[in-house]
């Protein structure tokens, strides 16, 4: 995908990895970058606008846990304004295994609902032009951090959902791929709660091992966007970008 002159919606594009990715995207010159986030960050938005004044950066308040109908209403507002959207990035996520319901609601259900909502505008069966979905999942979707099983399972679910959307592309015209960061130095991982407090030092233990910066992750994220490979499972770890070959153990045969 050529980012220049495109229209992009980025859910949670003002967070750690999200903000640095937004910076890299803006440098590439899209026509519009629409940021949907729960918390407004005027300083970050102004920085993005100053980084490339030719890019129109807009913000809408959005909580991914709202009902599907509300998400559709918000997207209609955006589509009415832009007419077309090329890429949806789903980046909302929390890491706190004390908040079981919210972890599933944000990390999985929110991704499903936002993707489902945009199908009203993209699905070729409804006369739509198709589109591209990039879902930020996690390497914990491959192999869990077992001390945070709820978080890991929510990311595995999002990864599975993304793979299914990719396989449905011949029917819907909508392609999809997953972005799976390894341990990245963000506020998210500096301190978080393990499930039932099984390991109070889990964040500290993870950060004892090699990590990557948000800038490294963001730069590789943009490379994955540009590659635009339907069904790709991208691992962004230790400053490297790698396409993962998924091992199939079972097939529905349909």
Curated annotation (Swiss-Prot):
GO molecular function term, any single one: alcohol dehydrogenase (NAD+) activity
Domain of life: Eukaryota
Enzyme Commission numbers on file: 1.1.1.1
A GO cellular component annotation in the UniProt record: cytoplasm
Binding residue positions for substrate: 138
Residue numbers binding NAD(+): 10-33
Gene3D superfamilies cross-referenced by the UniProt entry: NAD(P)-binding Rossmann-like Domain (3.40.50.720)
Catalytic activity annotation: a primary alcohol + NAD(+) = an aldehyde + NADH + H(+); a secondary alcohol + NAD(+) = a ketone + NADH + H(+)
Biological processes per GO annotation: alcohol metabolic process
Active-site residues from the entry: 151
Record bears the keyword NAD: yes
Classification via PANTHER family: 15-HYDROXYPROSTAGLANDIN DEHYDROGENASE [NAD(+)], ALCOHOL DEHYDROGENASE-RELATED
Protein name stated in the entry: Alcohol dehydrogenase
Taxonomic lineage from the root: Eukaryota, Metazoa, Ecdysozoa, Arthropoda, Hexapoda
């Amino acid at each position: 995908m050529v980012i220049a002159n495109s229209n992009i919606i980025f859910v949670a594009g003002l967070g750690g990895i999200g903000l640095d990715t937004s910076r890299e995207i803006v440098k590439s010159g899209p026509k519009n970058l629409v940021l949907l986030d729960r918390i407004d960050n005027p300083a970050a938005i102004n920085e993005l606008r100053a980084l490339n004044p030719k890019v129109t950066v807009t913000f809408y308040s959005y909580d991914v846990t709202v009902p599907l109908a509300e998400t559709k209403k918000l997207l209609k507002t955006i589509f009415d304004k832009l007419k077309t959207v090329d890429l949806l990035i789903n980046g909302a996520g929390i890491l706190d295994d004390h908040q079981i319901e919210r972890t599933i609601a944000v990390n999985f259900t929110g991704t499903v609902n936002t993707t489902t909502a945009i199908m009203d505008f993209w699905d070729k069966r409804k006369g739509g032009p198709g589109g591209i979905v990039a879902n930020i999942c996690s390497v914990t979707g491959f192999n869990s951090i077992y001390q945070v099983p709820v978080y890991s399972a929510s990311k595995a679910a999002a990864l599975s959902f993304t793979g299914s959307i990719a396989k449905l592309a011949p029917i819907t015209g909508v392609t999809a791929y997953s972005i799976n960061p390894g341990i990245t130095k963000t506020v998210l991982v500096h301190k978080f709660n393990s499930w039932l407090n099984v390991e109070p030092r889990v964040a500290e233990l993870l950060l004892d091992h090699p990590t990557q910066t948000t800038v490294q992750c963001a730069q590789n994220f943009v490379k994955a966007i540009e590659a635009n490979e339907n069904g790709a499972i991208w691992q962004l770890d230790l400053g490297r970008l790698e396409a993962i070959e998924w091992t199939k153990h079972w097939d529905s045969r349909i």
